Amino acid sequence: MFYWILLALAIATEITGTLSMKWASVGNGNAGFILMLVMITLSYIFLSFAVKKIALGVAYALWEGIGILFITIFSVLLFDEALSTMKIAGLLTLVAGIVLIKSGTRKPGKPVKEAARATI
């Protein structure tokens, strides 16, 4: 469970970092760029710890997919970016992919011990 929390933190900091990049690009201050640098750095640190126990493909797909989903939603809400029918279809496909990836994730089973063999 701890590693899933780390993955959630990686996703949240990625979203914050990417949104602050946009905020800095439309504003006049450097605070947005500094916030972006800190958040993206933290995101990769959290992700690197999360993949110790979560399969890399699953962690990366969830990190990137959920990040794209929320970045798009917040971009529409905060920066008045357009949300076309094609973007909505893409986001729905993305959500379906995230669900499929997560549902296909299983905990590894316990290793099976080999029977003792006599050596000759």
Swiss-Prot record:
Domain of life of the source: Bacteria
InterPro entries the UniProt entry points to: Small_drug/metabolite_transptr, Small_multidrug_res, Spermidine_export_MdtJ
Pfam families in UniProt: Multi_Drug_Res (PF00893)
One cellular component (GO) term of this entry: plasma membrane
Gene Ontology process terms (BP): glycine betaine transport
Keyword annotations of the record: Cell inner membrane, Cell membrane, Membrane, Transmembrane, Transmembrane helix, Transport
Segments crossing the lipid bilayer: 1-21, 31-51, 54-74, 81-101
Principal location: membrane
Membrane-related topology note: Multi-pass membrane protein
Subcellular compartments: Cell inner membrane
GO MF annotation terms: amino-acid betaine transmembrane transporter activity; antiporter activity; choline transmembrane transporter activity; spermidine transmembrane transporter activity
Reported function: Catalyzes the excretion of spermidine.
NCBIfam families: PRK10452.1 (NF007767)
HAMAP family: MdtJ (MF_01598)
Family: Belongs to the drug/metabolite transporter (DMT) superfamily. Small multidrug resistance (SMR) (TC 2.A.7.1) family. MdtJ subfamily.
Subunit note: Forms a complex with MdtI.
Protein's UniProt name: Spermidine export protein MdtJ
Origin species: Salmonella agona (strain SL483)
Gene: mdtJ
